[in-house]
């Protein structure tokens, strides 16, 4: 994907979250079953980095379940981080950092840190182009302890007829279909107004190739979420 298209897709998603951040957060007041499954298996004293932490619901859930390790959340949205600060108990060993995960220096504030677990739920599918995804994964790998785990989820929206009906032609965003990659889609948003956002639909083969290219191997894969239990693809990776 050429740099201009990458920049336009990133701008599209930034504008979406700036415009519909409050409405989006209202739809994310409960964690998905797959996320809860992952969190319930975590060591309660782990050093945890949560990429794309959003409104802090994950951190609140951890505290309620007795987590007493270190939690650091990273997100680009000031509005969502402000909401997270209001939610997370002051007693929690938690810190929040505003940084754009698409930027080359998003990890600057974490220099020299090591984590037992890096989480990236619903993050990679909003990053356009393989090179941008690889860069994030390489940085995540560098932040992991030697025995650490990278755990992520990918939205499998094509498994839902309702969501498939929300797909929009690229022309609505002023982008040509020939300029995007296979698996790239434009979805609409209808809560509190009409918006558009970019999402990539990952296949298992794509994720395997990404893991291999960035020095990981896949330990576990499972599907969860939605009425049919297959709207989220979850994986646990370990550095090779």
Residue map of PLM features:
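SAM-dependent methyltransferase
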Residues: 151-210, 220
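Core SAM-dependent methyltransferase catalytic element
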Residues: 224-240
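Conserved S-adenosyl-L-methionine
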Residues: 216-226
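A conserved beta-strand element that flanks and buttresses the S-adenosyl-L-methionine
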Residues: 119
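Conserved class I S-adenosyl-L-methionine
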Residues: 1-43, 45-52, 57, 61
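A short glycine-rich, Lys/Arg-flanked "PGG" loop and its adjoining helix->strand segment in the class I
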Residues: 134-146
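Class I SAM-dependent methyltransferase SAM/SAH-binding core
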Residues: 55-106
């Amino acid at each position: 994907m050429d740099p201009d298209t990458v920049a336009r897709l990133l701008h599209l998603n930034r504008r979406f979250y700036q415009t519909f951040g409050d409405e989006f957060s209202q739809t994310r007041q409960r964690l998905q079953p797959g996320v809860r499954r992952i969190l319930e298996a975590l060591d309660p004293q782990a050093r945890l980095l949560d990429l794309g932490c959003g409104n802090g619901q994950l951190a609140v859930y951890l505290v309620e379940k007795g987590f007493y390790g270190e939690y650091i959340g990273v997100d680009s949205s000031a509005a969502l981080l402000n909401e997270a600060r209001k939610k997370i108990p002051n007693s929690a060993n938690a810190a929040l950092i505003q940084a754009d995960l698409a930027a080359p220096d998003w990890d600057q504030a974490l220099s020299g840190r090591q984590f037992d677990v890096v989480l990236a739920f619903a993050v990679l599918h909003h990053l356009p182009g393989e090179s941008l995804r690889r860069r994030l994964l390489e940085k995540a790998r560098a932040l992991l302890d030697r025995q650490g785990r990278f755990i992520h989820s990918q939205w499998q929206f094509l498994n839902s007829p309702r969501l498939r009906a929300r797909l929009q032609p690229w022309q609505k965003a002023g982008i040509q279909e020939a300029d995007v990659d296979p698996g790239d889609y434009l979805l609409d948003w209808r809560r509190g107004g009409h918006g558009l956002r970019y999402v990539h639909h990952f296949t298992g083969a794509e994720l395997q190739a990404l893991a291999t290219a960035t020095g990981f191997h896949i330990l576990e894969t499972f599907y969860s979420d939605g009425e049919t239990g297959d709207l989220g693809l979850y994986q646990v990776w370990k550095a090779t």
